[in-house]
């Protein structure tokens, strides 16, 4: 396998329905996160040189919804648009409750946490502090005038929250000594397949990088009855792999054409993918699944990506209600993420940061069906809302 488009999705809704023993939830919020996530993924794909990207748009959206409560008028309008519309209080309340719901999951397989570091020279505005509490944010003071020490403190938190998988997402040069407040979000997931792959059956197999290039990759094999669908409109086939953890699953989206990934992504960015995922149904026969094992690590420059999806004012417009007695503006927005898929399951996580400085110091049974994943494809880990997503040119990723 060489190019991979990875979507890691978490589905947690309120209006549930059942199909063949599976519980699904479809909500307006889930659809909003789905569509916004695919737009961010599309821009990430277009900007990536090597096409190895894993990301968590949900992590970005949670921080934006928190920031919105103290932002300027134009920033609020842009943020509301990608968060699904509505008034600012409604948006913060909705995403705050979502964050609370995630915080109640068993941390053995899902951690969602927000940390706010406030400069010793500043205090959070009262209203913003109340919103931070709604998001169950931890708030600590920190001395940003010592950038290396500040970065070390933040990195220790990231390392702890991701169980050692993301150790140093914040470098010293990302910390402006004039920083007033920095907000960070961690999403970490560790799932085990309901039916594990047999490691003894993993072997080197061909993966089509493109129509002219074939490489060898360690490929796992599973013969199992699975949910499956063929989508002519999308130009892809889809298959579901459930986890032992209740409600979670991974969905593989395999383009019909070897070079079909960009076209599938283009269509997915227009309409989202959750509707297609909810249309999955039992294949009616065993699926002979072959899929590479892999590990991807990547970083996103959100200063570049967010304006392409309609959020640019946070980097320009002063936010009057984040801290007391001053206005701030976002100087840096970034994310570091990873995913690992092997015979036992999948581990994935993302660390997202928004750093704001004072405006005065602004900076930026029948026969089995063969489902052979041997060319660029898409996958979703899901329970109704996109948790992490990405794409990769597996030729240069870690395959083990």
UniProtKB/Swiss-Prot annotation:
Lineage, top ranks: Eukaryota, Metazoa, Ecdysozoa, Arthropoda, Hexapoda
Pfam families: Serpin
Name of the featured protein: Antichymotrypsin-1
CDD domains linked to this entry: serpin1K-like
InterPro entries: Serpin_CS, Serpin_dom, Serpin_fam, Serpin_sf, Serpin_sf_1, Serpin_sf_2
PTM: Does not seem to be glycosylated.
Function: Inhibits chymotrypsin activity.
Sites annotated Reactive bond: 359-360
One function term, GO molecular function aspect: serine-type endopeptidase inhibitor activity
């Amino acid at each position: 396998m060489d190019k991979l488009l990875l979507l890691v999705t978490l589905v947690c809704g309120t209006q549930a329905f059942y199909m063949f023993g599976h519980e699904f939830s479809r909500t307006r919020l889930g659809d909003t996160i789905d569509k916004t996530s695919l737009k961010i993924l599309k821009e990430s794909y277009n900007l990536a040189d090597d096409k190895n990207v894993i990301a968590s748009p949900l992590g970005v959206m949670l921080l934006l919804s928190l920031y919105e409560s103290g932002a300027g008028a134009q920033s609020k309008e842009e943020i509301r648009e990608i968060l699904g519309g509505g008034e600012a209080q409604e948006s913060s309340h909705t995403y705050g409750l979502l964050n609370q719901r995630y915080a109640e999951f068993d941390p053995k397989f899902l951690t969602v946490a927000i940390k706010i570091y406030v400069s010793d020279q500043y205090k959070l505005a009262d209203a913003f502090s109340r919103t931070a509490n709604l998001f169950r944010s931890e708030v600590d003071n920190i001395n940003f005038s010592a950038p290396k020490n500040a970065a070390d403190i933040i990195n220790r938190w990231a390392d702890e929250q991701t169980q050692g998988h993301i150790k140093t997402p914040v470098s010293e040069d990302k910390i402006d000594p004039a920083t007033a407040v920095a907000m960070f979000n961690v999403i970490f997931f560790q799932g085990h397949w309901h039916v594990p792959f047999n490691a003894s059956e993993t072997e080197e197999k061909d993966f089509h990088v493109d129509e002219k290039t074939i490489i060898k990759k360690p490929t796992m094999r599973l013969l199992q009855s699975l949910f499956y669908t063929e989508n002519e409109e999308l130009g892809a086939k889809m298959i579901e792999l459930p986890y032992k953890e209740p409600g979670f699953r991974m969905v593989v989206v395999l383009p019909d054409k070897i070079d079909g990934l960009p076209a599938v992504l283009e269509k997915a960015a227009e309409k989202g993918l959750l509707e297609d995922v909810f249309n999955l149904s039992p294949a009616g026969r065993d699926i002979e699944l072959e899929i590479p094992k892999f590990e991807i690590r990547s970083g996103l420059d959100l200063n570049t990506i967010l304006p392409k999806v309609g959020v640019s004012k946070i980097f320009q417009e002063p936010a009057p209600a984040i801290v007391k007695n001053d206005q701030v503006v976002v100087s840096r927005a970034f994310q570091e993420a990873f995913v690992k898929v092997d015979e036992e399951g999948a581990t994935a996580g993302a660390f997202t940061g928004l750093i704001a400085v004072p405006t005065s110091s602004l900076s930026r049974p029948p026969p089995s069906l063969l489902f052979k994943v041997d060319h660029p494809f898409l996958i979703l880990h899901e329970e109704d809302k996109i948790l992490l997503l990405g794409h990769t040119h597996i030729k240069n990723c870690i395959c083990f």
